[in-house]
Amino acid sequence: MKTLIKYNLLLVSLIFCFTPTQEVKSQDFGADVASSYVWRGTQFGTGPHVQPWMELGAGNLTGGIWGSFALDATRNASDNELDLWVSYDFGPLALTVTNYSFPGADGTYSAGGVFDGDIEVSGSTSLGPVDLTVGYFTDLEALYIEAGFPIGPVGVAVGYGSDGAGAFYAGGDSGLVNVSFSGEKDIKITEDYSLPVFGSFIYNPDAEAAFLVFGFSL
């Protein structure tokens, strides 16, 4: 199953590469710089990270690359992450397959390669004001369910993790792993440019860990 998903990801990537330019409806790229990298209630690495991304879209199909790299690469080389993903929007439901990989400081892999990462299949939908996401890692047998909703200008997310094959979200068990409160605003730099900034307070009840993250987008 994992091998099949990897080949499908590679196939979709090749389709995007050889699709005529006029058929690619959208493309975008950018980067975030964050004081630390916290994902689903768990901190990955220490210190600030730069997180570039690129994506292409053709109709309801979208594919992209997302990365996270420690700014101090010599000290935190193991913190690097490079993810490939493809998503199809069916209207009320979007399905996404993501390949998570972890290259070294020089971009190479100690085992396998960029297509030999951990595979997650996820679905997302909206139920009124609530955004619901369910993700499942096929080899790790780890399940994550998150509900996100606004309270005024504040974005709130509540995430539940359940581990199967080993410790991942909740130390080999299951529980509430992510309660976060986020906000964002634009800081005016010039008449024509404002810098988007964001901040999040993240609490992991299962691990009894708390984080405060600040960042900006380019």
Q: What do the PLM-derived regions correspond to, one by one?
A:
Residues 1-28:
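Cleavable N-terminal export/targeting peptides
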Residues 23-26, 60, 92, 126-129, ...:
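Short loop/turn motifs that connect adjacent beta-strands in outer-membrane beta-barrel proteins
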Residues 24-72, 134:
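Short glycine/proline- and aromatic-enriched beta-strand/turn motifs that initiate or cap beta-hairpins
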Residues 30-34, 55, 64-68, 87, ...:
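Transmembrane beta-strands of outer-membrane beta-barrel proteins
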Residues 46-50, 78-82, 115-121, 139-145, ...:
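Residues that define the transmembrane beta-barrel architecture of outer-membrane proteins
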Residues 63-89, 95-113:
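Surface-exposed loop and membrane-interface regions of Gram-negative outer-membrane beta-barrel proteins
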Residues 109-166, 171-174:
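Detector for outer-membrane/organellar transmembrane beta-barrel domains
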Residues 125, 149, 181-183, 187, ...:
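Outer-membrane beta-barrel "beta-signal"
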